[in-house]
């Protein structure tokens, strides 16, 4: 069964800002999420349907927010920790 990977417009905009080397790290993180969606941490409160996977790109911690079910993975947002959750809440309203 093939798993469908979808991107939100916010994620696509944030991915465009990365260089090729950073995109390779991102692709590894996305592949991990496809194989095992529980690799991230499920958020609580207002963001209880969101999972966040944390990974490093050249000594900088990045967060990748996503939702998942058996058939798909929806990549919602990508960024550094600064204002990440505030911007995520604003986007999801």
What is each PLM-predicted segment?
Residues 1-29:
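Arg/Lys-rich, positively charged N-terminal/basic patches that mediate binding to nucleic acids
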Residues 31-58:
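A short, surface-exposed loop/turn module that caps and links secondary-structure elements
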Residues 12, 51-53, 70:
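Short alpha-helical segments used as structural interaction elements across diverse proteins
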């Amino acid at each position: 069964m093939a798993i469908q990977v979808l991107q939100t417009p916010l994620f696509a905009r944030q991915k465009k800002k990365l260089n090729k080397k950073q995109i390779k790290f991102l692709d590894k993180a996305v592949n991990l999420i496809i194989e095992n969606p529980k690799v991230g941490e499920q958020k609580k409160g207002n963001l209880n349907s969101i999972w966040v996977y944390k990974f490093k790109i050249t000594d900088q911690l990045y967060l990748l927010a996503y939702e998942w079910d058996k058939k798909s993975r929806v990549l919602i947002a990508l960024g550094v920790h600064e204002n990440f959750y505030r911007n995520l809440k604003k986007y999801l309203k």
